[in-house]
């Protein structure tokens, strides 16, 4: 019985090798399916966009401390104050 099984398997081995060789010839490594790649990229972008919108609308990302509302030009004034404060400080001498 084992001999018959080995014989049948030995007959199937060349068939399997021949079919894999044909598949390798058919499969061109430089042939890309751009349509599927484009659709996959668009689906990925839509999912990320939707997750971003849901995060913004859910308001789960909150600061742990209360901030008072600032005027639109307040950030620029704060940066200018820091620049002038750093410019007027005396340089510390290092030993």
Curated annotation (Swiss-Prot):
Residues 1-18 form the signal peptide. Gene3D superfamilies: Single helix bin. Residues 59-95 are cytoplasmic. Its main location: membrane. InterPro entries: FXYD_motif, Ion-transport_regulator_FXYD. GO terms for molecular function: sodium channel regulator activity. It comes from the Eukaryota. The chain crosses the membrane at residues 36-58. One of its GO terms (biological process) is sodium ion transport. Residues 19-35 are extracellular. Disulfide bonds: none annotated. Keywords: Cell membrane, Ion transport, Membrane, Potassium, Potassium transport, Signal, Sodium, Sodium transport, Sodium/potassium transport, Transmembrane, Transmembrane helix, Transport. Pfam families: ATP1G1_PLM_MAT8. It is found in: Cell membrane. GO terms for cellular component: plasma membrane. It is a single-pass type I membrane protein. Belongs to the FXYD family. PANTHER family: FXYD DOMAIN-CONTAINING ION TRANSPORT REGULATOR 6-RELATED, SODIUM/POTASSIUM-TRANSPORTING ATPASE SUBUNIT GAMMA. Regulatory subunit of the sodium/potassium-transporting ATPase which is composed of a catalytic alpha subunit, a non-catalytic beta subunit and an additional regulatory subunit. The regulatory subunit, a member of the FXYD protein family, modulates the enzymatic activity in a tissue- and isoform-specific way by changing affinities of the Na+/K+-ATPase toward Na(+), K(+) or ATP. Associates with and regulates the activity of the sodium/potassium-transporting ATPase (NKA) which catalyzes the hydrolysis of ATP coupled with the exchange of Na(+) and K(+) ions across the plasma membrane. Reduces the apparent affinity for intracellular Na(+) with no change in the apparent affinity for extracellular K(+). In addition to modulating NKA kinetics, may also function as a regulator of NKA localization to the plasma membrane. This is FXYD domain-containing ion transport regulator 6. It comes from Macaca fascicularis (Crab-eating macaque). The lineage of its organism: Eukaryota, Metazoa, Chordata, Craniata, Vertebrata. The gene is FXYD6.
